[in-house]
Amino acid sequence: MSAPPERRPATLDDPPVDVSDPHELLLRYLDWYREALLRKLDGLTEPELRAPVGPLGWSPLGLVKHLGWVERRWMRWGFAAEDVLAYPSEDDEAEWRVPADESVGDVLAAYHDEVRRSRALAASADLAEPARLGGRFRAAAQAPSLGRILFHLFQEYARHVGHLDIARELLDGTVGE
């Protein structure tokens, strides 16, 4: 027995159903969530982007800033062992705060830059390749594979895009993918 058409879930538009390579699938789904994050910001005013949402305590723009730090921490410092600042120096909550002198454009540009760098690193390595030593990971026994790191990013985005979906509904009633 099948569900009536109005009860069938929408078909995801990406990745296409004929993509079966695990590396490509993972990267395409991760990009889908990155794009969903940005879609959920569409139509919000600057005050809505900056204001903490209800009981959540963070702003939509703060979430974007946090995910930029997550990309940097896991891909550049974690996987590539680049000598980069992995956490803001102020305190644990600093990566969620957007000061008044930091523009929406600045936050989005920094986020896009980290995503671009992550994509380049992920495209140039095999899923089984271990993280390089010297950044986040000091010993081979600690170093996860690129695949494991990408799955971590995937779950981070899935969780936070879901949070943003709730935040958006609280802000203006908008729901959906």
Report the location of each language-model feature:
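Active-site rim elements
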Residues: 20-26, 104-108
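Acidic/histidine-rich alpha-helical segments that form the ligand environment
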Residues: 95-133, 148-154
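Short, contiguous alpha-helical
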Residues: 2-16, 23-41, 46-94, 134-177
